[in-house]
Every structure is written in structure tokens, then in C-alpha cells.
């Protein structure tokens, strides 16, 4: 899916919501544990209840890796289900990969070719040659970690390197790489005050923004400083939606939470 196609979906649905599928066997309703594939059963129920209110889904790969082969099978089934039933929805592999070139090339093949994700999160710390293998897939997006939502972001990401903070250096350097139009960036909602400066560097690229909801980030602040004329935002919400309830009607309640966020987003889109 191209950035233009993603924007079209956002305007059509009046939503730039991304639902994070951080599926944890310790948190899903206990009755699902008797299912043959409880992770997929949970994901399917969440997707069916929320798809009309969002434009993207973001499985956090660690939650699937943690349960071994069964987790990978559930992840693949989830993506295949999305492709079959809701092909207009954008998919993000929240994998935070990044390694020397030949290793990154294998990561790219795994997530783009085998699993068929539209995009993947990548840690850019090892530099250009660790990111290029992902950018070689010109029909996919590479989402670089720029300024993350966790408290530890201040340990390194805001340190000055020369006359600029490290996160700014990452953004400024990467925008000159090949196929940089296929780059997106992770900027946490808890760092909304930095968005105006970031938009001076990358006025058009999409930003994936975690931290609205459970981490306390403000949707209004993110939109105020980060939204572009083409929207340019994907706001992720995971726990606030998927774990809104552990009762038998968990999916219905998740759908209501997603709808509430979609309504807020529609109000923000009216300001464009």
C-alpha cells in the first residue's frame, strides 16, 4: 500500500487509528485458552470488532515470538486473515529489527515476502547499510525509530551530537537515503512537544505515534503539531482497546473504544 493509498483510506474512514495487536496469553479472556489457537481467536475477534474504525493493525512481534512456533503460526494466520477479509487495511510488523546488511536482508524477506506485511519498524542505530535492505522493497514502508514514547528515550535519543539532538540527526540523515519517500518514523505521543521541530525536517513523511491512551499521550496535541495536509499520522493504541475488558464481550467493548477514538479523529480531520 502506498502512502497515497493510505491517505485515501484515512479520509474515507475518517480515521488514522492503528490498533496494536500485543496479544498476551496472560491478559486475554481465560475462556479463550481452551481454543486450539487462542492467540488467533483473540486477534480475529478484535479485528472483526474494530476494522471499521481503524486503517491499520500492528502486531508486536515479541508477543508472538515469546510462545514459540505456535506464536509464529498465529501471527501468519492473523496476517492472512487480514489480507483475505480486509485487504484495504495497512499492516505493520512491530519488530524493531536492524542489523548488518545480509542479516537485515533476511529480516526484510521474512516480513515483507513470507508474511506479507506492508511495513516494519526498524532500529537505525547501525546506520544506512542496516536499513537499505528494507528500503530495496519499493512497495513497502520502513518505519525508523526516531523519538520513542518510553522514559528511557531521554537516555540517548535527545543527547546532542554536534549541534543537534541524536533523533534529529537520525531523521535528517535518513531523509537523504534511497527511496526515502518510503520511510516513516516512530515519534511517541508523550513527546508531542517535539513534533513541530520534527515536521520542519520531514514535512511529508508519515509518523507512527504510539503512546496515546495507556501511556498518557494526547491525541489533540499530536494532531496540533504533527498533522499535515495529507494527514501524515498513524496513531497507535494497543492496551486501551484490546484489553478494555476480559469478559465474554471483550471484542464488543474493544470495538466501542476504537469507535470513540475514530470519532475523536474525525473531529481532528475536520480541521484540515
Swiss-Prot record:
BP GO terms, sorted: 'de novo' pyrimidine nucleobase biosynthetic process; 'de novo' UMP biosynthetic process
GO function terms (MF aspect): orotidine-5'-phosphate decarboxylase activity
Alphabetical list of InterPro entries matching this protein: Aldolase_TIM (IPR013785), OMPdecase_type-2 (IPR011995), OMPdeCOase_dom (IPR001754), RibuloseP-bd_barrel (IPR011060)
Gene3D superfamilies assigned to the protein according to its UniProt record, in alphabetical order: Aldolase class I
Record flagged with keyword Iron: no
Record CDD domains: OMP_decarboxylase_like
UniProt keyword list: Decarboxylase, Lyase, Pyrimidine biosynthesis
EC annotation from Swiss-Prot or TrEMBL: 4.1.1.23
Residues annotated as catalytic: 96
Pathway(s) the chain acts in: Pyrimidine metabolism; UMP biosynthesis via de novo pathway; UMP from orotate: step 2/2
Reactions this protein catalyses: orotidine 5'-phosphate + H(+) = UMP + CO2
UniProt-listed PANTHER family: OROTIDINE 5'-PHOSPHATE DECARBOXYLASE
Family listed: Belongs to the OMP decarboxylase family. Type 2 subfamily.
Listed name of the protein: Orotidine 5'-phosphate decarboxylase
Amino acid at each position: 500500500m502506498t502512502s497515497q493509498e493510505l491517505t485515501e483510506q484515512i479520509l474515507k474512514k475518517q480515521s488514522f487509528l492503528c490498533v496494536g495487536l500485543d496479544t498476551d496469553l496472560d491478559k486475554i479472556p481465560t475462556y479463550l485458552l481452551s481454543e486450539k489457537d487462542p492467540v488467533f481467536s483473540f486477534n480475529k475477534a478484535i479485528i472483526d470488532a474494530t476494522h471499521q474504525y481503524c486503517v491499520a493493525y500492528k502486531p508486536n512481534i515479541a508477543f508472538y515470538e515469546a510462545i514459540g512456533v505456535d506464536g509464529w503460526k498465529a501471527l501468519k494466520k492473523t496476517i492472512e486473515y487480514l489480507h483475505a477479509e480486509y485487504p484495504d487495511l495497512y499492516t505493520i510488523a512491530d519488530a524493531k529489527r536492524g542489523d548488518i546488511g545480509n542479516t537485515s536482508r533476511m529480516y526484510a524477506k521474512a516480513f515483507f515476502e513470507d508474511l506479507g506485511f506492508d511495513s516494519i519498524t526498524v532500529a537505525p542505530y547501525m546506520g544506512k547499510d542496516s536499513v537499505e535492505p528494507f528500503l530495496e522493497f519499493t512497495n513497502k514502508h520502513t518505519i525508523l525509530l526516531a523519538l520513542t514514547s518510553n522514559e528511557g528515550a531521554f537516555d540517548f535519543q535527545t543527547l546532542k551530537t554536534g549541534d543537534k539532538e541524536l533523533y534529529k540527526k537520525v531523521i535528517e540523515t535518513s531523509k537523504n537515503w534511497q527511496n526515502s519517500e518510503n520511510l516513516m518514523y516512530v515519534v511517541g505521543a508523550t513527546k508531542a512537544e517535539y513534533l513541530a521541530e520534527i515536521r520542519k525536517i520531514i514535512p511529508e513523511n508519515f509518523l507512527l505515534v504510539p503512546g496515546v491512551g495507556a501511556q498518557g499521550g494526547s491525541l489533540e496535541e499530536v494532531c496540533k503539531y504533527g498533522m499535515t495536509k495529507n494527514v501524515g499520522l498513524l496513531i497507535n493504541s494497543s492496551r486501551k482497546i484490546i484489553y478494555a475488558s476480559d469478559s465474554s464481550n471483550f471484542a464488543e467493548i474493544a470495538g466501542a473504544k476504537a469507535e470513540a477514538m475514530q470519532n475523536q479523529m474525525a473531529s481532528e480531520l475536520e480541521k484540515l
